[in-house]
């Protein structure tokens, strides 16, 4: 289950008083969405996925491994990288390497051992 790709948003040019987007509204994504997306993953994980083992995909604002780690701790079994690819095409490699090092520091052999590992 994919959790949060975009949320409805709008921007207005205050001088022309017109919408900045041709369709008036659009989807907010990237780093601005990240904290909202992490909370949504956590909510769905606690309500459904933890007990049902439903796979969750965290989406929104993954620019570095720490962002992916937040999704994993919140309950995501996978993480999608969109904006990060525009910023740096090597983002997926850097994220994977960072997650592997993090897992070792956490004392586990696999990143998957940290899914839903948020300590309240």
Q: Which residue ranges define each predicted feature?
A:
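Glycine/Thr-rich beta-alpha phosphate-binding loop at enzyme active sites
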Residues: 2-50, 54
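Alpha-helical structural signal in soluble globular domains
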Residues: 43, 47, 74, 94, ...
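Generic secondary-structure signature for well-ordered alpha-helical cores
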Residues: 46-50, 100-108, 120
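Conserved, mostly hydrophobic/aromatic
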Residues: 1, 44, 71, 110
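Glycine-rich phosphate-binding active-site loops on the catalytic face of alpha/beta enzymes
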Residues: 2-10, 61-62, 67-94
